Amino acid sequence: MDADLDTLLADLQRRMDGAMETLKREFSGLRTGRANPALLDPVKVEAYGTLMPLNQVATVAVPESRMLTVQVWDRGMVNATVAAIRDCGLGLNPQPDGQLIRVPLPLLTEERRNELARAAGKYAEGARVAVRGVRRDGMETIKGFEKKHQIGEDQGRDWADRVQKLTDATIKKIDELLVEKEKDIRQV
């Protein structure tokens, strides 16, 4: 039966880690005071009749702490790329220079910092909800084992305690990521 527990815990851990990775991806799209190429990950460019991620039509680099550069591979894509960056909702003003697009990052206002911190909180809460959903699935699996008399009540409680500890540890990591991201956002 320990093999079943190990399999269950490994599956739950994998799913909880997936929620953490999603949270990290969402956090990388939130603007902080520093330039980060991942900031432009959500940008989609109209290319060849379809919407394509920016990283499939250009290279993003960080030459300075408050500047991104976007090197477009196809000269014909420069205007579409500039428009996509301008319209992505991050308040950026791209400046084309041949095939190179400079994207200066303006200072964040206090109001914008608060909005970003709230968005980070919402993302973290979404991750917590996902982790609790995984926990619920694990608990239901344990109850199913108990009903089928594959494990006893005591063993079921032990398994449930281990699932709860896994959940608590993952939620603690989520909270730590949130504190770190809020610190980055509020840093002037």
Curated annotation (Swiss-Prot):
Where would you say this protein principally sits, based on its record?
cytoplasm
- Disulfide bridge map: none
What GO cellular component term, any one, is given? cytosol
Key word Transferase present: no
Gene Ontology terms, MF aspect = ribosomal large subunit binding
Q: Where in the cell is it found?
A: Cytoplasm
Q: Which SUPFAM superfamilies match?
A: Ribosome recycling factor, RRF
Does the keyword Cytoplasm belong to this entry? yes
Q: Biological process (GO) annotations?
A: cytoplasmic translational termination
- Entry-linked Pfam families: RRF
Q: Which sequence ranges form a coiled-coil region, renumbered to this chain?
A: none
Q: Which keywords fit this entry according to its UniProt record? A: Cytoplasm, Protein biosynthesis
InterPro entries on file: Ribosome_recyc_fac, Ribosome_recyc_fac_dom, RRF_sf
The record's comment on protein family reads: Belongs to the RRF family.
Q: What does this protein do?
A: Responsible for the release of ribosomes from messenger RNA at the termination of protein biosynthesis. May increase the efficiency of translation by recycling ribosomes from one round of translation to another.
Q: What is the protein name stated in its UniProt record?
A: Ribosome-recycling factor
Upper lineage is: Bacteria, Pseudomonadati, Pseudomonadota, Alphaproteobacteria, Acetobacterales
